[in-house]
Amino acid sequence: MKNKLINTLAFVGIALISTACSQNTQSQVQQPNETPDKPWSVKMVESEMARWPESWQLDFQPKLKWDYCHGLELQAMLDVYDRYGDDKIYEYALAYADTMVNADGTIKMYKREEFSLDRVNSGKFLFRIYEQTKDEKYKKALALMRSQFEDHPRNEDGGFWHKKIYPNQVWLDGIYMGAPFYAEYAFRNNEVGVYQDIINQFLMAARHTYDPITDLYKHACDVSRKEKWADPVTGQSQHSWGRALGWYAMAFVDALEFIPQHEAGRDSMIITLNKVAQQIKRLQDEKTGLWYQVLDRSGDEGNYLESSCSVMFVYTLFKAVRKGYVDPSYLAVAEKGYKGVLEHFITTDDKGMISITKACAVAGLGGKNYRMGDYDYYINEQIRDNDPKAVGPFIMASLEWERLQEVRKIVNN
């Protein structure tokens, strides 16, 4: 209750600032001009539950899978449940948890020995499932995933490999997949000794992927410089992929709230987050408020405005402003981006179901069907509607937007 009050008071202050500045920014940022009969976050959750009646079907799955997309979207759905209620949402998330987690705490389709950070993100929503049910199997499942970090392969500077099959590689995606779970587990279980390890994951990734020429973070880095996709000098991949930076950005705002303010290195995390925020602001498309699939080739032929990175950036900036990590001026960037998402990516069918369009289905580096990570690769990967990697962050961004509107009503009244 105390933390909620502090956050509300802080956001009221931000709302006062943004209201006072509204006359100056009116020409730049318009309010989203369509108000649904329900909050956008609720409409998207209801639409997804209608599209995929069984929660294991999320991410277009024909069979059971322990997948980071399920964790992402179900976490967002539980955020909606926490804010607006509706037991159907909770039961939907619980059904996946109950199906996938066995009575002894083992998890179907989860293989610890694969050392995949992706499989850890799948379990973040279990914290709240355990809180609600007090079923010990969820506590055991959380401990199982936490134990992965004890043996997970690392680079010499302590950075986790993205996966065992990707040795010596740091992917920005992986920071989101592992660090927020690690931080929340540490917070809930009083593991004060691991915060430095968590902070190091963020700062290590920044050191390895930052390109001073473009002033951007590249998708990944092979610290060993052995991969064909890696620059022989820096080890970095060729391009800055929008969603990779989106994952990294969201990881900051989600992990920081669990790291004590006095912890050494936390300030460095916030400095790096501000650097990311500056990049997001600089690369925002002036006309639409959105962001491109390949950030360092924004506006080039074949490149396109992509929904998943756009909603990730919007969510990050909204939350970073609310938490006081970045300057309140970034609120205008977030609002312009959110308006752009509603105008260019959100569609409504004749039944009232909403969809989010134009999301890159997948992008990676190396692997069996070797991916060089060149420009043509990124712009030619499959594009699809209602990809969870866009759906989940859209729900999260919408919740931040809705929270801001409620605070503004309080301020204006």
Residue ranges, per PLM feature:
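CBM-like carbohydrate-recognition segments
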Residues: 29, 33-69, 83-90, 99-117, ...
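Oxyanion-binding "anion nests"
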Residues: 249-298, 302
